[in-house]
Curated annotation (Swiss-Prot):
Keywords (A to Z) from UniProt: Hydrolase
One annotated GO biological process: acylglycerol catabolic process
TM regions (residue ranges): none
Organism per entry: Mycobacterium tuberculosis (strain CDC 1551 / Oshkosh)
Originating gene: lipZ
InterPro entries membership: AB_hydrolase_1 (IPR000073), AB_hydrolase_fold (IPR029058), AB_hydrolase_sf (IPR050266), Epox_hydrolase-like (IPR000639)
Top-level taxon in the UniProt lineage: Bacteria
Taxonomic path: Bacteria, Bacillati, Actinomycetota, Actinomycetes, Mycobacteriales
Protein name per Swiss-Prot or TrEMBL: Putative hydrolase LipZ
Tagged with keyword Nucleotide-binding: no
Similarity comment: Belongs to the AB hydrolase superfamily.
Length: 288
């Protein structure tokens, strides 16, 4: 690992042992409720590093899901969003005292909908007060999947994973940023290093199974968006080519009362492209 930004992020965190592997966790003190930041695919909690300074004294905790970032990346392993939700519960139990609010991006939005469903079932072991979903294809049939996502889900997925290169990753990753806020060379290098940590660049075909879970558990997770009785809002980069405004419109149909902050001119990674605007939008929905 050579990027100073990655080393600094790693050195400020710790690893929490779990039954399935060590999970990287970072947290900071501040006012409650604690803000839980959940990342997406194929990146990590590193995505939120520039958001955290704008949280205006709010307590926060973030983690790398199993198989991502600086967490362990076992293989073979049947990766599941249900397991990731269990790991969130473990991290919260070891890190947080008191109430929690969630800010979730991309894949993390589906982990969050499972947490909402567990709360509806009376099975969530922590006090979740509010949630914000951001640029996640919760309603998969409304999303515009990238070609590499389709290949990784296919029988050719293991072959495609072995062929992943830094150049190919950088080109593909860069296409989901907005033209006004392009992917920088430094960000691309850091993201590639985190992907490759613990040979993670060899398992994207295993991790991509979360898309199938979005179909399998659609009734449960869409129902949670519709029926969860606490404040739920959406923060959305409107120039996202993957989780497009078509997804956002579907979420609005599921939950017409939801508060929405639209971020024009931002792509799939609004927290990287415009961290201050993203943080302010999230805080406006999560903190009284």
């Amino acid at each position: 690992m050579t990027s100073p930004s990655v080393r600094e992020w790693r050195d400020g965190g710790r690893w929490l042992p779990t039954a399935v592997g060590k999970v990287f966790v970072r947290s900071g003190p501040g006012d409650t409720p604690t803000m839980l930041l959940l990342h997406g695919y194929p990146s990590s909690s590193f995505d939120f590093r520039a958001v955290i300074p704008h949280l205006t004294g709010q307590a926060w905790v973030t983690m790398d899901f199993l198989g991502f970032g600086l967490s362990d990346k076992p293989r073979p392993h049947r990766y599941s969003l249900l397991e990731q939700a269990h790991l969130v519960e473990t991290v919260v139990a070891h890190t947080v005292t008191g109430a929690v609010v969630v800010l979730a991006h991309d894949m993390g939005t589906s982990v969050t909908t499972e947490l909402l469903a567990r709360d509806l079932d009376g099975r969530l072991p922590f006090d979740l007060r509010r949630a914000v979903l951001s640029n996640g294809s919760v309603i998969l049939e409304r999303a515009s999947l990238r070609p590499i996502q389709k290949v990784l889900r296919s029988p050719l997925g293991p072959v495609a994973a072995r062929l992943v290169s830094r150049g190919g990753f950088t080109r593909g990753f860069g296409r989901i940023f907005s033209p006004a806020h392009p992917l920088s060379a430094q960000e691309a290098q850091a993201q590639w290093e985190l992907l490759c940590y613990n040979d993670g660049n060899r398992i994207p075909h295993l991790l991509i199974s979360y898309l199938d879970e979005r179909i399998r558990h659609a009734q449960r997770w869409h129902g949670a968006v519709r029926d969860w009785p606490k404040p739920l809002g959406f923060v959305w980069g409107l120039d996202d080519p993957v989780a497009t405004t078509n997804v956002l419109n579907g979420l609005r149909e599921l939950r017409p009362s939801a508060a929405v902050v639209e971020l024009p001119g931002l792509g799939h990674y609004p927290q990287v492209e415009a961290p201050k605007a993203y943080a302010e939008a999230a805080l406006s929905l999560l903190v009284d």
